[in-house]
C-alpha cells in the first residue's frame, strides 16, 4: 500500500534535514530502489548539491560522492527522466520562442480574415510583444488543464456558459459582453494553435505524457519527496502529484505550515499560512479519496533544535505571523546586529550601501560572497545599476533574473533588416542595421590602413558614422542609396586628402547598400515557400559575415574572461537556429501568394521578431563564490546566510496590483466559476493580495543568520516614496525605530561627515575605489565648511595608501582636482597667431582677419570664440533649413530683386506698385527666388529628399514675395533710393579675390599693443542694402540690415561690444567715402504679418514693417526719409511726434519735433561720430585680446527687464565649455542707457 506523509513546520525550521533523514533511512533499507526528490526548477541545482552532501554525511561516505538511484528533479525534468525513451516524447519540441512564433502567425491571419474578431485587442494587437502575452495566456490555460473545446462559446455545458450562468441576474451585462468577446478571441487562437502544433510537443504535452506514463508504470519501488512547493500546484502539476501519491511506494511532502490542520477548519484568509493550509487539506482529501493510500501522521517541527535560523530571524517570523493576524507582538528587549534597517536618498545610494555592507561583512572573515542573497520585489528599478556598482565595489555578482533577447544585436539586426525592406531603405532603419556591428564589408583599397584586416569593424563603423552625418545633413534615404552619381561632401578645391577620404567613406557605405545589401534582400523576396525563404535568409547571414562576426565577439569575450558575454552570443545564435528550425518544420511548406509577393517575407519578419521577443537568456553563474541577486517573489534555496531586501517601499511590500496578461482579475474570477474540479487557474485578485505577506515572509526566512531591509526615499522620477509597513513594523519590533524622526535608528548618514565618529566613518569604508571617493568627498566638505577631519578619517586615508601604493598617486591627483577650476589656460601669443592669422596660403601673418559677427561672439564669450574660430569646432549638420540657410536664401532673393530694379534705369521700386507693373513685379520676384535657390543647391537637394523641407521652402517663397512687395510699397513713402545690395567690404582680404564694387576692409593698426610690427585687424562684412538720400547738395548714406526677428538697436549692447555690427558698417562706409554724410543704420524685419483682409498693400501693412535702428536727428532729413512723419504718422521709421516726457539725449530730434520709439535712437552727427569711434576702440581691444591669447570662459550677462540675457543663449558648445551657472562667474553688464548718456555728457565737459 502506498503511503503519504507530511513534514510540517514554519519557515524557520529545517525541513530539508528531516526529509534527508527520512531519505537516508529508506535508502539504507532499500539501496536499489529509486528516489525522486522534486523541487521547483529555480532551486534544482543548489538542492541537488545539498541533497548529495547530506546523504554523503548520513551514509558516512568519503571522497567524491554520486548517486545513481537518487535524482533531484523539477516537474519538467521528471518528464524527461521517466519518459525519455517514449517515442512520442521524442517528437520535435516546440520552445516558448516557437510557440510565440506560431501565435504571431495566427494573430496575423485573424487580422486578415476576421478583423472584427480582434476588436477587443485592436490597439494591443499592433504592439510589439502582444504575441508573447497571448502565448503566456495559452500556456496558463494549458497548465490549468483547460482544452480549447472547453472554451467554445456556444457549448451549452462548456466553461464559458457555466461562468456566465453563475452571475445571472447580477447586473453585470457589460462585464459579460467584454468577457465573452475576450474568451471568443482566446478560443479561436487556442483552437488554431493546437491544430498548428500537432507535429510538435509543447511543455503541457510533455506533462500529459508524464501523467500517462505514471498511470501505467510500476512505481512500487519508487520513493517520492516534494519540497519547497509553497502555496499550490498548477492543475497539471496537481494531477502528476496525485498520480505519484497513488502509484509510488511512499510520498513525503514538506509544507510551510505552523500546525497540523487535520480535522480543523482552515484558518482565516488573512492568516500567514492560509494558502499552505489549504494546499495541505486539498492533498489530504485527494489521498483519502484514493484506494490504497495510507496517510501517516505528519512530522511536525516544533522543537528549538530543529530550527535552521538565528534567534533574530525567529523574531522576524513571530512578527510576520502576528502582523498577518493584525496583532502587535511585544517588542524585543534589546536591539540585535543580526537584523538592520536603513534608508537612502536614491536607489543608487541604496545599492551602494548594500554593496558596502556586503564588503564589510566579508572582510570580517565570517562570510563568503556566496553567503549573500540580495532581493527586491522587481529588479527593473535596479537592473541598469547592479553590475556597475557591484563592479566598483569589487564584488562578484550573479543576477538570476532572466534577461530578454529582444535587445540583442542579432534581434535588432533582424528587425532592422526587414524594416529596411518594408519601408524602402529609410536612413534611420539603414543606420540601425549597420550600427549593430554585424555587417563588416571588405574595406576599399583607398581606405585600407596598414596593419588592419581587410574587414575591420572599426574602419567600417567610422565610415557609417560619417555617412549618417551626411544623410542627416542632406536628407538622404530611400531611393538616394541607389543614385548612380557618387555622393560628395563639398569643400575646398582641389580636394584635400582628408576630404577625399571622407568622400570615399560615404560612398563605400552607399555602394555597399546599393551593390551588396539591396540585391541580397531582393533575392529574399523571390522565395516561393517558407522553407526556401528561411534557407535564403540563413545563407544571407553567412555570406554577409554575420555568423563570423558573432563568433569573433564570442572569441573576444572568451579571451577577456567575459563568460556572460560569451554565453550570450552562443545562446542568441542557438535561439536563432531554433527559430529557423521551428519555422521550417511548422510553416516551411507555406507558399507565397502570387497576388501579394511581399507577404511571405513580411510574415517571416513578424514571426522572427515575435520569436526574439519571447526569447530569454538562460542564466548560469560564472563562479561559485558570487552574491546572488534575485526577486523576492521567487523561491530561493535556503543555504545562504545573509539577506538584503532592497526597495522595501509600500508600493511593492506588500504589492497590490492587478494580474498581468490579457485577462483581468474580474475575468479570471468569472472564468474560475465555470471550471471543473480538475481545472484551476493561478491565484489572482484578492487571493493574490492576501498571499503577499506569505511571499514576503518566505523571502525574509530564506537565509539563516542575518536580515537587512532598505528603501530609497525617492524614485527615479524624483517622486517621494513611502517606507514599507514591514520595514517600519520590524524596525519597531527590534527597537530600531525612531518615532520622533520617523526613521530607523540604525539609518546611515546620507553623506560622509568630516566630524564623524569611527562608527559613522565605518559605513563609508568599502572597496578602495569607493572608499577613496568617499574620502575625497569628505575632504572637500571639510575644506568648504572649515571643519577638520576626525582621526577616523585620517586613519582611512593612511589605510588606503598602505593597502596599495598606487592609490597614493591617484588620491593626490583627485585631491588636486578639488582645487581645479573650470578655467581656460590663455594661449601663448605665438599659438594665437598661428590659430587666428594664418592665411589661405598657410603663412602666419600678424593680421587678424575676421568678420564683425566674430568679434561680437568674442564679447559675448571669449571661449566660444576660441572654440569656433580658433579650433574651428561646429555642431553636427542635420536635415533642416537652419536659420543661416533660410537667412541666406531670403537675403539673396531680396538682393536679386532690388538689384534687378537698380539695373533698369527707367524703373524704380515705387513704380512696381502701379497696376500696369504688377506683372513685372511678379516676374522679378519669381526670378529672384530662382536665382537665390541657384546659389544654394544644398537646399534644392534637401527639398528633393524631404517633404518637410520642401514645405519650408514654399513658406520662404511666400515670405520673399511679401517682403518684395513691402519694399516696393515702402519706396512710395521715402526720397531714399537703394543704390547697392550685398555691398561687401574686406572680402578680398579673406578670399584673395578682389571685386570691382567691393569696399576696402575696415582696418585698424594695432602697433603699440605689444603684438609686434605690422599688427593690425582687418574686418570684412556685407551690407544687405545701401540706400542714399539726396537733400539739396548733400548725399546721405543709409545702411539697411535684414533680420528674421524683431531686432532693435540697443545702445548698451553697442557700447559694451555685444552689438558691433551697425556702427562698424558705418565706420566702413565713412572710411571708403569720407565725402558723404552718414544717415544711420536701420534693421528691417523679414516676416509675413497678419493683416486684416482688404488692407494688404496699404499703410496698415506698412506699419507692420517699420525700420528700427539709429539715425541722425536732423528733422528735415527724417521727414525726407519718411513722408509719413507729418500729420498721418510714421510709415517707415519707428519714430513718433515728440511728447513732453521724451527728454533723452538719444531719443529726440534736433528741432524737438520727433522722438524715437523703443528700439530706435536719434543722435546728433557728433554723438554718432563718438559712438563710431567707441566702436572702433572696441574692435581694436577685441583684436588685441584675441591675438594675446585671451580665451577665458566668461560669458556676459545683462538684466533686461525681467529677462537675463547671457552669452550662453546661442552657444553650440555648452558641453565643451562646461560653464557652471551655479558659480555665477559671468561678466556682468550693468550699464544702462542713462549711464551711456552720462558718459557722453562727461566727455563734453
UniProtKB/Swiss-Prot annotation:
Disulfide links within the chain: none
Quote the EC number.
3.1.-.-
Major enzyme class: hydrolase
Alphabetical GO biological process terms? double-strand break repair via homologous recombination
Enumerate the cofactors the protein uses. Mg(2+)
Record keywords: ATP-binding, DNA damage, DNA repair, DNA-binding, Exonuclease, Helicase, Hydrolase, Nuclease, Nucleotide-binding
Gene Ontology molecular-function annotations: 5'-3' exonuclease activity; ATP binding; double-stranded DNA binding; helicase activity; hydrolase activity, acting on acid anhydrides
Identify the stretch(es) annotated as Disordered: 737-758
Keyword NADP attached: no
Residues spanning the membrane: none
Query: Superkingdom of the source?
Result: Bacteria
Q: Where is the composition biased (Basic and acidic residues)?
A: 748-758
SUPFAM superfamilies assigned to the protein according to its UniProt record, in alphabetical order: P-loop containing nucleoside triphosphate hydrolases (SSF52540)
Q: Which HAMAP family match?
A: AddB_type2
Question: Its function?
Answer: The heterodimer acts as both an ATP-dependent DNA helicase and an ATP-dependent, dual-direction single-stranded exonuclease. Recognizes the chi site generating a DNA molecule suitable for the initiation of homologous recombination. This subunit has 5' -> 3' nuclease activity but not helicase activity.
Q: What else is known?
A: Despite having helicase-like domains, this subunit does not have helicase activity.
Q: What family does this belong to?
A: Belongs to the helicase family. AddB/RexB type 2 subfamily.
**Description of how the protein assembles with itself and partners:** Heterodimer of AddA and RexB.
Designated name of the protein? ATP-dependent helicase/deoxyribonuclease subunit B
Identify the species of origin: Limosilactobacillus fermentum (strain NBRC 3956 / LMG 18251) (Lactobacillus fermentum)
Amino acid at each position: 500500500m502506498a503511503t503519504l506523509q507530511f513534514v510540517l513546520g514554519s519557515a524557520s525550521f529545517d525541513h530539508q534535514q528531516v526529509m534527508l533523514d527520512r531519505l537516508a533511512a529508506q535508502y539504507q533499507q532499500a539501496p536499489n530502489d529509486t528516489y525522486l526528490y522534486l523541487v521547483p526548477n529555480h532551486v534544482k541545482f543548489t538542492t541537488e548539491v545539498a541533497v548529495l552532501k547530506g546523504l554523503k554525511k548520513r551514509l558516512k561516505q568519503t571522497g567524491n560522492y554520486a548517486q545513481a538511484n537518487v535524482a533531484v528533479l523539477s516537474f519538467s525534468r521528471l518528464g524527461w527522466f521517466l519518459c525519455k525513451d517514449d517515442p512520442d516524447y521524442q517528437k520535435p519540441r516546440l520552445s516558448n520562442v516557437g510557440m510565440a512564433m506560431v501565435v504571431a502567425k495566427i494573430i496575423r491571419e485573424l487580422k486578415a480574415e476576421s478583423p472584427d474578431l480582434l476588436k477587443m485587442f485592436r490597439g494591443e494587437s499592433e504592439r510589439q510583444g502582444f504575441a508573447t502575452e497571448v502565448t503566456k495566456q495559452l500556456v496558463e490555460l494549458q497548465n490549468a488543464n483547460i482544452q480549447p473545446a472547453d472554451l467554445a462559446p456556444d457549448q451549452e455545458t462548456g466553461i464559458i456558459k457555466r461562468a456566465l450562468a453563475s452571475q445571472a441576474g447580477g447586473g453585470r451585462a457589460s462585464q459579460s459582453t467584454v468577457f465573452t468577446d475576450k474568451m471568443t478571441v482566446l478560443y479561436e487562437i487556442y483552437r488554431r494553435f493546437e491544430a498548428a502544433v500537432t507535429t510538435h510537443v509543447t511543455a503541457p504535452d510533455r506533462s500529459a505524457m508524464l501523467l500517462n506514463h505514471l498511470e501505467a508504470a510500476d512505481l512500487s519501488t519508487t520513493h517520492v519527496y516534494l519540497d519547497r512547493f509553497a502555496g499550490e500546484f498548477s492543475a497539471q502539476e496537481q494531477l502528476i502529484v496525485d498520480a505519484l501519491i497513488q502509484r509510488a511506494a511512499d510520498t513525503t511532502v514538506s509544507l510551510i505550515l505552523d500546525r497540523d490542520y487535520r480535522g480543523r477548519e482552515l484558518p482565516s484568509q488573512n492568516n500567514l499560512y492560509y494558502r499552505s493550509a489549504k494546499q495541505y487539506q486539498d492533498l489530504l482529501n485527494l489521498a483519502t479519496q484514493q484506494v490504497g493510500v495510507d496517510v501517516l501522521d505528519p512530522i511536525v517541527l516544533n522543537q528549538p533544535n530543529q530550527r535552521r535560523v538565528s534567534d533574530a530571524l525567529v523574531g522576524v517570523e513571530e512578527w510576520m505571523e502576528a502582523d498577518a493576524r493584525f496583532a502587535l507582538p511585544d517588542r524585543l528587549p534589546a536591539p540585535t546586529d543580526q537584523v538592520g534597517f536603513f534608508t537612502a536618498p536614491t536607489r543608487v545610494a541604496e545599492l551602494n550601501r548594500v554593496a558596502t555592507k556586503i564588503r564589510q561583512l566579508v572582510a570580517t572573515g565570517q562570510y563568503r560572497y556566496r553567503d549573500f542573497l540580495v532581493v527586491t520585489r522587481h529588479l527593473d528599478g535596479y537592473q541598469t545599476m547592479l553590475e556597475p556598482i557591484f563592479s566598483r565595489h569589487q564584488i562578484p555578482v550573479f543576477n538570476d533574473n532572466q534577461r530578454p533577447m529582444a535587445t540583442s544585436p542579432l534581434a535588432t539586426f533582424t528587425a532592422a533588416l526587414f524594416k529596411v525592406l518594408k519601408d524602402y531603405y529609410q536612413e534611420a532603419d539603414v543606420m540601425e542595421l549597420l550600427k549593430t556591428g554585424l555587417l563588416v564589408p571588405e574595406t576599399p583599397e583607398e581606405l585600407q590602413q596598414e596593419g588592419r584586416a581587410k574587414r575591420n569593424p572599426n574602419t567600417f563603423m567610422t565610415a557609417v558614422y560619417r555617412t549618417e552625418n551626411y544623410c542627416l545633413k542632406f536628407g538622404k534615404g530611400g531611393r538616394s542609396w541607389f543614385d548612380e552619381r557618387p555622393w560628395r561632401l563639398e569643400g575646398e578645391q582641389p580636394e584635400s586628402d582628408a576630404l577625399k577620404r571622407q568622400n570615399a567613406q560615404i560612398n563605400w557605405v552607399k555602394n555597399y547598400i546599393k551593390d551588396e545589401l539591396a540585391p541580397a534582400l531582393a533575392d529574399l523576396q523571390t522565395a516561393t515557400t517558407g522553407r526556401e525563404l528561411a534557407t535564403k535568409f540563413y545563407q544571407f547571414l553567412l555570406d554577409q559575415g554575420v555568423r563570423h562576426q558573432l563568433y569573433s565577439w564570442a572569441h573576444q569575450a572568451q579571451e577577456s574572461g567575459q563568460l556572460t558575454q560569451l554565453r550570450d552570443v552562443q545562446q542568441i545564435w542557438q535561439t536563432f537556429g531554433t527559430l529557423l528550425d521551428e519555422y521550417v518544420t511548422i510553416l516551411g511548406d507555406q507558399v507565397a501568394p502570387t497576388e501579394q509577393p511581399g507577404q511571405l517575407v513580411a510574415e517571416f519578419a513578424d514571426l522572427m521578431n515575435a520569436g526574439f521577443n519571447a526569447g530569454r537568456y538562460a542564466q548560469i553563474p560564472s563562479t561559485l563564490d558570487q552574491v546572488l541577486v534575485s526577486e523576492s517573489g521567487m523561491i530561493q534555496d535556503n543555504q545562504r546566510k545573509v539577506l538584503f531586501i532592497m526597495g522595501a517601499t509600500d508600493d511593492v511590500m506588500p504589492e497590490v496590483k492587478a494580474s498581468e496578461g490579457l485577462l483581468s482579475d474580474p475575468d479570471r474570477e468569472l472564468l474560475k466559476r465555470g471550471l471543473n474540479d480538475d481545472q484551476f487557474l493561478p491565484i489572482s485578485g484578492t487571493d493574490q493580495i492576501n498571499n503577499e505577506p506569505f511571499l514576503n515572509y518566505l523571502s525574509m526566512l530564506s537565509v539563516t543568520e542575518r536580515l537587512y531591509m532598505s528603501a530609497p526615499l525617492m524614485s527615479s522620477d524624483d517622486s517621494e516614496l513611502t517606507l514599507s509597513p514591514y520595514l517600519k513594523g520590524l524596525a519597531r519590533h527590534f527597537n530600531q525605530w525612531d518615532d520622533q524622526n520617523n526613521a530607523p535608528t540604525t539609518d546611515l548618514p546620507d553623506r560622509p561627515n568630516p566630524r564623524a565618529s569611527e562608527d559613522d566613518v565605518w559605513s563609508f569604508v568599502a572597496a578602495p575605489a569607493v572608499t577613496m571617493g568617499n574620502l575625497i568627498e569628505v575632504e572637500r566638505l571639510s575644506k568648504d565648511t572649515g571643519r577638520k577631519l576626525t582621526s577616523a578619517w585620517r586613519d582611512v586615508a593612511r589605510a588606503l595608501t598602505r593597502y596599495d601604493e598606487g592609490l597614493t598617486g591617484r588620491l593626490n591627483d583627485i585631491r588636486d582636482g578639488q582645487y581645479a577650476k573650470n578655467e581656460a589656460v590663455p594661449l601663448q601669443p605665438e599659438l594665437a597667431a598661428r590659430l587666428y592669422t594664418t592665411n589661405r596660403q598657410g603663412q602666419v601673418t600678424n593680421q587678424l582677419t575676421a568678420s564683425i559677427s566674430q568679434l561680437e561672439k568674442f564679447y559675448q564669450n571669449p571661449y566660444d570664440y576660441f572654440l569656433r574660430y580658433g579650433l574651428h569646432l561646429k555642431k553636427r549638420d542635420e536635415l533642416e533649413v537652419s536659420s543661416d540657410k533660410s537667412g541666406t536664401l531670403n537675403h539673396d532673393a531680396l538682393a536679386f530683386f532690388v538689384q534687378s530694379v537698380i539695373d533698369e534705369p527707367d524703373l524704380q521700386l515705387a513704380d512696381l506698385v502701379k497696376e500696369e507693373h504688377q506683372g513685372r513685379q511678379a516676374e522679378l520676384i519669381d526670378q529672384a527666388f530662382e536665382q537665390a535657390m541657384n546659389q544654394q543647391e544644398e537646399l534644392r537637394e534637401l527639398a528633393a529628399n524631404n517633404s518637410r523641407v520642401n514645405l519650408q521652402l514654399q513658406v520662404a517663397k511666400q515670405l520673399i514675395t511679401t517682403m518684395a512687395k513691402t519694399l516696393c510699397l515702402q519706396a512710395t513713402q521715402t526720397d531714399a533710393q537703394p543704390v547697392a545690395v550685398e555691398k561687401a567690404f574686406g572680402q578680398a582680404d579673406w578670399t584673395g579675390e578682389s571685386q570691382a564694387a567691393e569696399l576696402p576692409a575696415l582696418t585698424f593698426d594695432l602697433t603699440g599693443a605689444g603684438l609686434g610690427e605690422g599688427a593690425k585687424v582687418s574686418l570684412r562684412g556685407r551690407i544687405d542694402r545701401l540706400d542714399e538720400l539726396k537733400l539739396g547738395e548733400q548725399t546721405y548714406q543709409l545702411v539697411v540690415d535684414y533680420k528674421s526677428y524683431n531686432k532693435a538697436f540697443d545702445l548698451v549692447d553697442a557700447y559694451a561690444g555685444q552689438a558691433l555690427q551697425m556702427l562698424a558698417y558705418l565706420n566702413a562706409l565713412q572710411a571708403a567715402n569720407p565725402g558723404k554724410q552718414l544717415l544711420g543704420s536701420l534693421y528691417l524685419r523679414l516676416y509675413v504679418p497678419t493683416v486684416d483682409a482688404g488692407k494688404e498693400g496699404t499703410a496698415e501693412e506698412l506699419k507692420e514693417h517699420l525700420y528700427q535702428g539709429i539715425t541722425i536727428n536732423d528733422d528735415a532729413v527724417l521727414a525726407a526719409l519718411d513722408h509719413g512723419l507729418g500729420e498721418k504718422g510714421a510709415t517707415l521709421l519707428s519714430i513718433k511726434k515728440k511728447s513732453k516726457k521724451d527728454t533723452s539725449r538719444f531719443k529726440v530730434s534736433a528741432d524737438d519735433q520727433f522722438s524715437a520709439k523703443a528700439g530706435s535712437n536719434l543722435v546728433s552727427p557728433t554723438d554718432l561720430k563718438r559712438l563710431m569711434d567707441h566702436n572702433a576702440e572696441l574692435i581694436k581691444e577685441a583684436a588685441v585680446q584675441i591675438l594675446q591669447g585671451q580665451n577665458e570662459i566668461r560669458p556676459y550677462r545683462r538684466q533686461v527687464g525681467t529677462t537675463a540675457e547671457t552669452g550662453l543663449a546661442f552657444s553650440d558648445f555648452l558641453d565643451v565649455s562646461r560653464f557652471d551657472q551655479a558659480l555665477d562667474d559671468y561678466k556682468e553688464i550693468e550699464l544702462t542707457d542713462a549711464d551711456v548718456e552720462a558718459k557722453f555728457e562727461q566727455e563734453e565737459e
